[in-house]
Amino acid sequence: MPDWLIALILGLIEGLTEFIPVSSTGHLLLLGHFLGFHSPGNTFQVLIQLGAILAITGVYFGRLWGLLTTLPTEPGSRRFVIGILLAFLPAVFVGVAAHDFIKTVLYETPALVCSTLIIGGFILLALDRMKLEPRYTDVAEYPLKTAFIIGLFQCLALVPGVSRSGATIAGALLLKCDKRSAAEFSFFLAMPTMAGAFAYDLYKNIDKLSTNDLGLIGIGFLAALVSGVFVVKTVLDFITRHGFAPFAYWRIAVGVVGLALLYIPR
């Protein structure tokens, strides 16, 4: 299969999975492994996230603009923005400190990705079935302490296969946030987190990228942008109707199939 087609497929997968709790990075690493696709420093999986970043920023532009323009006058807007920044900080410190270990060890261990997909699937399924009475139904109501703790949960997603959205949503549910607002907070937190990961990874690996790499990243970026817009516009209603169980079953299935492909002789 030509590299450009693999890049297109991986870009579509990135956009389709980035904002749902199934681990986009886990899917990209497993697909790349089985398709024989490798990028210098494992940068492709991170850099095509720019498409997903633009997708969610475009869909939520009106909401973002409203927050920014009301910052001087609305205490609720200020608290929400501060909460997002507090939730973002833990991943900055842990991500920078562990960056090389994550990229050279964890990203190169497909069995770990499969295992975390399965374990995370069972955890998500358990949380979905728990009858937790929500205390918060609007992201603007989240206390700063709640936002910061959700940010600590996000650090778990530095392990590929855990899922950034899955970790933050799980943390929010345990902190008595309802499903829809938990997913929405995860969306907003994704913007600085993914933008930061993109910028730092580009800084660390810019000298390793060739013209061909940039072309493949461009294809993946565009595919992630298009598929990401579709998911962001539809996933909140899907979660409201169906909860997180479908994503949990998908994670478990992908993890089991991945382990089978890795260890069953062919």
UniProtKB/Swiss-Prot annotation:
Entry's transmembrane regions: 4-24, 46-66, 82-102, 105-125, 142-162, 182-202, 216-236, 244-264
Pfam families for the chain: BacA
Reaction(s) this enzyme catalyzes, per UniProt: di-trans,octa-cis-undecaprenyl diphosphate + H2O = di-trans,octa-cis-undecaprenyl phosphate + phosphate + H(+)
Membrane topology according to the record: Multi-pass membrane protein
Record's subcellular location: Cell inner membrane
Source domain of life: Bacteria
GO cellular component assignments: plasma membrane
GO biological process, one term: peptidoglycan biosynthetic process
E.C. number(s) listed in UniProt: 3.6.1.27
UniProt entry keywords in alphabetical sequence: Antibiotic resistance, Cell inner membrane, Cell membrane, Cell shape, Cell wall biogenesis/degradation, Hydrolase, Membrane, Peptidoglycan synthesis, Transmembrane, Transmembrane helix
Entry GO MF terms: undecaprenyl-diphosphatase activity
Stretch forming the signal peptide: none
Functional note: Catalyzes the dephosphorylation of undecaprenyl diphosphate (UPP). Confers resistance to bacitracin.
Family: Belongs to the UppP family.
Other remarks on this protein: Bacitracin is thought to be involved in the inhibition of peptidoglycan synthesis by sequestering undecaprenyl diphosphate, thereby reducing the pool of lipid carrier available.
NCBIfam families associated with the record: PRK00281.1-2, PRK00281.1-4, undec_PP_bacA
Protein name: Undecaprenyl-diphosphatase
Species of the source: Caulobacter vibrioides (strain NA1000 / CB15N) (Caulobacter crescentus)
